[in-house]
C-alpha cells in the first residue's frame, strides 16, 4: 500500500461556482432519500484512539484487530484510483480514513470520490497502521452525514483575515487548532475557579441581569424597556449590590460568574459584553481578599496550563512568586521617580501634569476631583502600563471608591485594591462599606457628579440602603475579569481572541 504526498486540491473556480456545484450534489442526495441522516452514533474519538494506540505497532494491530466507529469533518481527501485516504477531524482531533471499493463497495466508493472537503462523514472499520506509521481506520462502512455547501479556507493560508475570524468564528474553529485550544483553556480556567470557590465553601448564585437601577460600578449602562411593567430597565453593569444583599440575608460566602454589559467603547481590552466573577465573603477584609485572589489565579493557571509560569507576548510572567503590593503614589514614584511627595500632593501641579499627558481635566469627572482622584489619573498615565509583574495597587481614595470601606487610620483612603499584570487591570476588590449612612452620603455625592455631567457616576439605590440598614457583617468582595485572565493564560493579545463571538460592526 502506498501513500501520496499530502496536497490540497487546487481551487479552479470561484466560491460561487463551488457552492453551485455543491448544491447540485445536495440536490442529487435529496433525490436518493435522506440527505442529512441522523442515525449514526460514533463510539470513539480521534484523540482517544491516537493516545490509546500510540504504542501499538502495525503487527500488534494486525494480530489484535480493533473495531471502531468515528465521525467528523473531512479536512483532506486523496483519491488514488482503487485506494483513497481522508483526514477526518472530530471535536478531539484528527484521524485518517483508508477507503477502498473492496471494503466499502463500489457504489459507496464512487460516491466518496464526489464528496467534498468540509463534509461530515462517518465510518466503521478496523484500526491499522500504514507503511508510514500513521494510525488509520480501514473503513468497512462509510457514510455521508452532512453536506457542506461552502468550501473551507485554503489549508495552507487558513483564515488570514482577522476580522473574518471573529465574524465567522465557526469557520475559525474548524480550521485553526490554536483557536480551539484557546477556548478549551478558557473552559478549564472557569472550571478551575468554580472548583476553587467550592473548596473554599462559597455558594454559586445567579442574580438579575435586568436592573431597575444600574449600580455596582462606574459605567454607562445599556437601557431597555420592560413592556409588561412599563418601566425603564438597565442591563446590569455589575452584580455587586445584589450579591451584597445576599450577604445581608445570611449567605456568608457567595460568588457569581456571569455577563456584565457596559455601553462603552471597544478596544483590545474592552468588549461591551464581558464575563466577570464576583465573590463576597463575610468576616474578611481586603488583605484577606488579596491573599485569596492571588491563590485563585495561581491555581487557575496551573489547572489550565499545567504551570504557574506563563509566556505572554514574548515575555515571561511568573505567577508562582508572591504578588507585589504598592500604593498609588508608590507606583507613580517607582516608574516616574522624579516626582516628589510635595508635587504629588499639589492640586495645581497634578492638573498641569495631566494636561501634559493629554488628559482633559475640564471634563465633568475632574471638575471637583480631589487630590486622590488626580493621583489616580496620573498613575494611569505613568505607571499602569509598566505593571508587568502581578501587582496589587492598594489604598484607593474614597472619592473614586463609593462602595468601599474607608480606612480607620488614613483619612480619605479606602481599603481597596486593584490587581494589575502585563499592564492591565485583572481584579478589583475591597473591604465593603457596610455603614448605611455613609453609603447613602456617598450615593448622594455620586448623584451630584451625575447631575454635573458624569455619565458613569452611580445612581442612588434606596433599596440597597434599606438592606444595609438591616445590618451587613464586615465583608470583603472582589471582581475578576475572566476574559482578561484568559487572555493572559492563552497568550492572546486582544479580548476578541478569547470571546467566541465578539461584538463587531455590522457587515453592511
Swiss-Prot record:
Q: Which cofactors?
A: Mg(2+)
Q: Which UniProt key words apply to this protein?
A: Aminoacyl-tRNA synthetase, ATP-binding, Cytoplasm, Ligase, Magnesium, Metal-binding, Nucleotide-binding, Protein biosynthesis
Q: Which InterPro entries match?
A: Aa-tRNA-synt_II (IPR004364), aa-tRNA-synth_II (IPR006195), aa-tRNA-synth_II/BPL/LPL (IPR045864), Lys-tRNA-ligase_II (IPR002313), Lys-tRNA-ligase_II_N (IPR044136), Lys-tRNA-synth_II_C (IPR018149), NA-bd_OB-fold (IPR012340), NA-bd_OB_tRNA (IPR004365)
Q: Which organism is it from?
A: Burkholderia cenocepacia (strain ATCC BAA-245 / DSM 16553 / LMG 16656 / NCTC 13227 / J2315 / CF5610) (Burkholderia cepacia (strain J2315))
Q: Can you cite an annotated GO cellular component?
A: cytosol
- Organism placement in taxonomy: Bacteria, Pseudomonadati, Pseudomonadota, Betaproteobacteria, Burkholderiales
BP terms from Gene Ontology: lysyl-tRNA aminoacylation
The UniProt catalytic activity note for this protein reads: tRNA(Lys) + L-lysine + ATP = L-lysyl-tRNA(Lys) + AMP + diphosphate
Q: Which CDD domains match?
A: LysRS_core, LysRS_N
Q: What is its EC number?
A: 6.1.1.6
- Name by which UniProt lists this protein: Lysine--tRNA ligase
Amino acid at each position: 500500500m502506498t501513500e501520496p504526498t499530502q496536497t490540497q486540491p487546487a481551487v479552479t473556480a470561484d466560491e460561487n461556482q463551488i457552492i453551485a456545484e455543491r448544491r447540485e450534489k445536495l440536490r442529487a442526495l435529496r433525490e436518493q432519500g435522506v440527505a442529512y441522516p441522523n442515525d449514526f452514533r460514533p463510539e470513539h474519538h480521534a484523540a482517544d484512539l491516537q493516545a490509546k494506540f500510540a504504542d501499538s505497532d502495525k503487527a500488534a494491530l494486525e494480530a489484535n484487530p480493533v473495531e471502531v466507529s468515528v465521525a467528523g469533518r473531512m479536512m483532506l481527501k486523496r483519491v488514488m484510483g482503487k485506494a483513497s485516504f481522508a483526514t477526518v477531524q472530530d471535536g478531539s482531533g484528527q484521524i485518517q480514513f483508508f477507503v477502498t471499493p473492496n471494503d466499502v463497495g463500489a457504489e459507496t466508493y464512487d460516491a466518496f470520490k464526489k464528496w467534498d472537503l468540509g463534509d461530515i462523514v462517518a465510518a466503521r472499520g478496523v484500526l491499522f497502521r500504514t507503511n508510514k506509521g500513521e494510525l488509520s481506520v480501514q473503513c468497512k462502512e462509510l457514510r455521508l452525514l452532512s453536506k457542506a455547501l461552502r468550501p473551507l479556507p485554503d489549508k495552507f493560508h487558513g483564515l488570514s483575515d482577522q476580522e473574518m475570524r471573529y465574524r465567522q468564528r465557526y469557520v475559525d474553529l474548524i480550521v485553526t487548532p490554536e483557536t480551539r485550544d484557546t477556548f478549551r483553556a478558557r473552559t478549564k480556567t472557569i472550571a478551575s475557579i468554580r472548583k476553587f470557590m467550592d473548596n473554599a465553601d462559597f455558594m454559586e448564585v445567579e442574580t438579575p441581569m435586568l436592573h431597575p437601577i444600574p449600580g455596582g460600578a462606574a459605567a454607562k449602562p445599556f437601557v431597555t424597556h420592560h413592556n409588561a411593567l412599563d418601566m425603564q430597565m438597565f442591563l446590569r453593569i455589575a452584580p455587586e449590590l445584589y450579591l451584597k444583599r445576599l450577604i445581608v440575608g445570611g449567605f456568608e460566602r457567595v460568588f457569581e460568574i456571569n455577563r456584565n454589559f457596559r455601553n462603552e467603547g471597544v478596544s483590545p481590552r474592552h468588549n461591551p459584553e464581558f464575563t466577570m466573577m464576583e465573590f463576597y465573603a463575610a468576616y474578611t477584609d481586603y488583605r484577606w481578599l488579596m491573599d485569596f485572589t492571588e491563590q485563585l489565579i495561581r491555581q487557575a493557571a496551573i489547572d489550565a496550563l499545567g504551570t504557574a509560569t506563563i509566556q505572554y507576548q514574548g515575555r515571561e510572567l511568573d505567577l508562582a512568586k508572591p504578588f507585589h503590593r504598592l500604593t498609588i503614589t508608590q507606583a507613580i514614584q517607582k516608574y516616574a521617580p522624579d516626582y516628589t511627595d510635595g508635587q504629588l500632593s499639589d492640586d495645581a501641579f497634578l492638573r498641569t501634569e495631566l494636561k501634559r499627558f493629554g488628559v482633559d481635566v475640564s471634563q465633568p469627572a475632574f471638575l471637583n476631583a480631589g487630590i486622590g482622584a488626580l493621583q489616580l489619573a496620573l498613575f494611569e498615565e505613568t505607571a499602569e502600563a509598566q505593571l508587568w509583574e502581578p501587582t496589587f495597587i492598594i489604598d484607593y481614595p474614597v472619592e473614586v471608591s463609593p462602595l468601599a470601606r474607608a480606612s480607620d487610620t488614613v483619612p480619605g483612603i479606602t481599603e481597596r485594591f486593584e490587581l494589575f499584570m502585563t499592564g492591565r487591570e485583572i481584579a478589583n476588590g475591597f473591604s465593603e462599606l457596610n455603614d448605611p449612612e455613609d453609603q447613602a452620603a456617598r450615593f448622594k455625592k455620586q448623584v451630584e457628579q451625575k447631575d454635573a455631567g458624569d455619565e458613569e457616576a452611580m445612581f442612588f439605590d434606596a433599596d440597597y440602603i434599606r438592606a444595609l440598614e438591616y445590618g451587613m457583617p464586615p465583608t470583603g468582595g472582589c471582581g475578576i475579569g475572566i476574559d482578561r485572565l484568559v487572555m493572559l493564560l492563552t497568550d492572546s493579545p486582544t479580548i476578541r481572541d478569547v470571546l467566541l463571538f465578539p461584538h463587531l460592526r455590522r457587515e453592511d
